[in-house]
Amino acid sequence: NRYNLIYRNYDPELINFCKINQISFLGYSPLAFGMLTEKYFSNIKANSRLELYPDYFNRYSGKASKNAVIKYLNLSRSNKLELAQMSLSYCVNKSFLTSSIIGSTNLKQLSEIIESVNIELNQKIIEKINFIHSENINPTLEREFKLYNYFKRAAKLIFDGRFFDFYKKSVKFFKKLLRLNQ
């Protein structure tokens, strides 16, 4: 299950279910496809995952996600932590996570990942993380909600026998969505 600072859809229902039923909860994407690092803030490198897989990255690149990441970045800097280390430490120290799937492309990243296991976030930092989350609850869903509402309206048009209205609205919607992704 995807689990990171900007995608915590599983708090608390699924987590409680897993605890009660002694089911492991394996988290992946603790750095939100690199969004919870500083590498996608400027000077994006050629052949980076952002360039290679832009459609996948879209779930993390909405305005709400970016705003939340900036707040987490400011928090990490004010506590003399790398954003990646704070993000990883947050996930690693969650008692319900059995493990978290990580990845690195160089030794510096691997070193930061290993070091994050030894970083214990104090209660003040945890409270600030939770406060940021309360202001930006699951910002990655911004686009998913738009798609859900689109398909809900589309189904109604189709069932009402208004297929051509559906087609015209679809073209408008996807053009707008493409503009949002640029």
Language model features with spans:
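Membrane-proximal basic amphipathic "stem/tether" segments
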Residues: 143-182
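Beta/alpha (TIM)-barrel catalytic core signal, keyed to glycine-rich beta->alpha loops juxtaposed to Asp/Glu
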Residues: 1-131, 156, 165, 172-174
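C-terminal alpha-helix/helix-terminus motif
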Residues: 121, 133-137, 178
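Soluble, non-transmembrane catalytic domains of enzymes that act on hydrophobic metabolites at membranes
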Residues: 76-77, 129-141, 145
